[in-house]
Amino acid sequence: MWLGVDVGSTSTNLVLIGENQEVLDYCYIRTSGNPARAVEEGLEVLKPTMDMAGTAILQTAVTGSGRYLIAKKLGTDQVLDEITAQARAASFLNPDADTVFEIGGQDSKYISVKHGQVVDFEMNKVCAAGTGSFIEEQAGRLGIPLPEIGPMALRAKHPVELGERCTVLMESKIVSELAAGAGKEDLCAGLCRSIVRNYLNRVVVNKKVGQVVCLQGGIIHNEGIVSAFYEMLGDRLRITPYYDVTGAYGAALEA
């Protein structure tokens, strides 16, 4: 068995793969400011699968913002950057992939891939308005449980136009639209569309978007976001299997 670990600021993900690079088990854990504890919790979740397999972990690789800290704790020198890990998983799971869109809790990435190799990439600079944490904050502002944002967005009749704005301006616009009587479903739809526009206009910008675009990251749990991406990309869009743990899967493949 091989283990991949992706330690991010929002979530910590672990993936176990077998000799044919198939996923044996995986888990998605909230980091909650304590990556070491999150990894320990993840290993406990995977322990029954490891015990059942009856074989040891041959190698572990770590990626994510906390990769050096956790690699040291796990006693491995297999460390890789997040761009490489995300591209590796996308290319393995979608061999025709030429573009990867990955949106996480605190950052978002654009990756251009050719024959499985990274040829270009970009990450969000400062604005958080194209990331998962922003949606979570606005869900709290609207008084809506986070899992309900997507379904409510899909029920919208007249999505509110929030435009492409930075975090502060978008928050102000949401408050003013609420005060003006906008429905929460329409606001949810506007929020999802605006997140996608912010990502495309502030991260991708003028970068090449190919014909097979793999969408990855925990934000895909939000159906409203996925729908907004489909509106803009059509049948070029692919939802990568294991989309919320692709960083850890890519690390496992490199282990």
Name each model feature, range by range.
Residues 42-58, 199-211:
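Phosphate/pyrophosphate-binding loops at sites that engage ATP/ADP/AMP, CoA/4′-phosphopantetheine
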Residues 34-35, 115-158, 253:
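Glycine-rich phosphate-binding loop plus the immediately following alpha-helix
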Residues 170-203, 244:
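Adenine-nucleotide phosphate-binding core of ATP-dependent small-molecule kinases
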Residues 77-83, 230-249:
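Conserved phosphate-binding/catalytic loops in two-lobed NTP-binding clefts
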Residues 88, 132-136, 227, 240-255:
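Glycine-rich phosphate-binding/hydrolytic loop that grips phosphoryl groups
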Residues 27-31, 50-83, 112, 119-120:
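Short beta-strand-loop/turn "lid" adjacent to the catalytic site in phosphate-handling enzymes
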Residues 66, 203-229, 243-247:
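Glycine-rich phosphate-binding loops at beta-strand->alpha-helix junctions
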Residues 2-37, 41-44, 121, 125:
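Short glycine-rich, Thr/Ser-proximal phosphate-binding strand/loop in the N-terminal lobe
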